[in-house]
Regions:
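A short beta-loop-beta micro-motif enriched in histidine and acidic residues
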Residues: 46-48, 72-75
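Short, charged/polar surface micro-motifs in flexible loops or helix N-caps
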Residues: 42-43, 85-86, 92-93
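Acidic, low-complexity mobile loops and tails
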Residues: 1-65, 98, 103-133
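Short, charged beta-turn/beta-strand-edge "cap" motif at the junction between a beta-strand
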Residues: 66-67, 72-74, 92-93, 117
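Residue-level recognition of beta-strand microenvironments
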Residues: 19-22, 72, 89
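ATP/adenylate-binding site constellation spanning eukaryotic-like Ser/Thr protein kinases
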Residues: 80-83, 115
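Short glycine-/small-residue motifs
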Residues: 32, 68, 89
Length: 133
């Protein structure tokens, strides 16, 4: 763990998303990877009330908006850290968006992707430094 509970077992984006890809990994994983938002994003958003996630089977592109998270404060777009095909959604989080803010790195994950290409990724340490975490 790095400061502000930023787990160091995954990679991050400047847009405050994480992906379960080992830091420094440059090859595309052969199995689907989980995607979620960071604790920094969750804290800034506050109480989440709605998740608009990409459909299973849809193709998404790293860095291009693929959905939204809506809180009592604002609506924020989701920018996936990888390109690929969405293989599953976290139905528990869709049914109860508070899971995303309560446990963004565990039960609050958003969706899984069979990645075809990695976007620009950061280590936990770099992400924490950039975000004062």
């Amino acid at each position: 763990m790095v400061a502000n509970n930023i787990p160091d077992d995954r990679s991050y984006t400047d847009e405050h998303e994480w992906v379960m890809i080992s830091p420094g990994q440059t090859s595309v994983p052969s199995t689907p990877v989980r995607v979620g938002i960071t604790s920094v994003a969750a804290a800034a958003l506050g109480e989440l009330v709605f998740l608009d996630l990409p459909d299973v089977g849809s193709d998404i592109e790293a860095g291009q908006s693929c959905g939204e998270v809506e809180s009592t404060k604002t609506v924020s777009e989701l920018y996936p850290p990888v390109s690929g095909k969405v293989t599953s959604l976290n139905q528990a989080a869709i049914d109860d968006p508070s899971l995303v803010t309560q446990d963004p790195y565990g039960t609050g994950w958003l969706f899984e992707v069979q990645a075809t290409q990695l976007g620009p990724l950061l280590t936990a340490e770099v992400y924490a430094e950039k975000n004062g975490a």
